[in-house]
Amino acid sequence: MGAGAVLGFISVFGAGLLAGEELVIRYGVRGPLGRLDQEPHIRMRQGLIRTLRILVPAILAPTLLSAVAVTVVDGADGGLALRCAAILALLAWVTVTLRGTVPINEAALDWDPAAPPGNWRALVDRWENLNFVRAWLAIGAFALLLAGLLS
C-alpha cells in the first residue's frame, strides 16, 4: 500500500467520523435537547461544548491535513477534482465554525443556567442554523473524499 492510499484512507476515515459526529448532533441530539427546560438544556449544551471542543478538532486536523497531503502525493489522478472539492468543503466548515458557532459556544459556556441572557434562545437558533450548514459540509466532504478514493 503506497503513501497515497494510506493518506486517502486516513482522510476518508476522518471525514466519516466528522460527518457522523455532525449528523448525530444535528439529527440525534438537537431534538431531545430542544425539548428540555431551560436549565437542563443549558447544562447539557455546556457539557457538549466542553467535550466537543476537544474531540472535533482532534478529528478535523488529521482529516484536513491528510486530505491535502493525498492531493499533493497523488497529483492529477482521477480523484483530484473530488479531493479539491472536499478540501474546499472542509475549509468552509472551518470558516462557519470559527466565525459562527465558536463565538456562540464561548458565550454559552458563561451562561448561568438559572438566569441566561434574554437572547439565549435566539443564539441557540442561530447556532442551529449554522450547524445545519456545518453538518452538510462535513457530509459532503466525506462523500467527495470517498468518491475521490474510489476513482
Segments and roles (model prediction):
Residues 4-20, 85-94:
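Alpha-helical transmembrane segments
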Residues 27-28, 60-77, 96, 100, ...:
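Membrane-helix exit/interface motif
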Residues 79-104, 108:
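Mid-chain, well-packed structural core segment of small domains
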Residues 1-10, 71-82, 144-151:
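Helix-coil boundary and interhelical linker segments in multi-pass alpha-helical membrane proteins
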Residues 6-7, 14-62, 109-125:
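Interfacial loop at the N-terminal end of multi-pass membrane proteins
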Residues 50, 57, 84-87, 125-128, ...:
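Internal alpha-helical transmembrane segments of multi-pass membrane proteins, especially GPCRs
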Residues 57-70, 134-142:
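Core segments of transmembrane alpha-helices
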Residues 109-151:
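A generic hydrophobic-segment detector
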